[in-house]
């Protein structure tokens, strides 16, 4: 419920930029936690942080969490294209209300280069049947490990090696940590 455009955040952004620390910020809708203010859901509210030199990871790529909510995936896509250090993660995208974003992410290579893996465990991944078909969807439900299921779905959707390795680059992890 913090508005990222609030001027009181500026010293925090300056500190993050100075120490080259990324900011993971929730974007889009949220129904798994109570009392979320929908007025602070747009990725556009992170413009001041980007302007100050902060690397941003927009959780959920600005997607809605329920029908009827405002969806910001197009705002995310524009910001990802416009700002070198603006990324989004795919956490919880394997939910029926968020999986529509796969079209934007997978079909626009410029945007896809700004997407990193996220799982949002323990949110249960539900395969997007409209993209994978009913047989593949049923097959994925046989996987009892939700983290593995999330990964297998994204692999089947066509997420490439760069996607799986991008978080290590964005988070500036040392090679031995990233490959562990």
Model regions and ranges:
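Helix C-cap/helix->beta junction micro-motif
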Residues: 18-19, 52, 82-83
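H/E-rich (His + Asp/Glu) clusters that bind or coordinate divalent metals
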Residues: 55, 62-180
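Short amphipathic alpha-helices and their capping/turn segments at secondary-structure boundaries
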Residues: 8-17, 44-48, 103-110
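Active-site gating/metal-coordination segments in enzymes
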Residues: 1-38
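Aromatic-anchored, glycine/proline-accented short structural segments
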Residues: 27-76
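Proline-rich intrinsically disordered, low-complexity coils
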Residues: 4-7, 11, 34, 43, ...
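Active-site glycine- and acidic-residue-rich loops that bind
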Residues: 1-7, 34-40, 66-69, 93-100
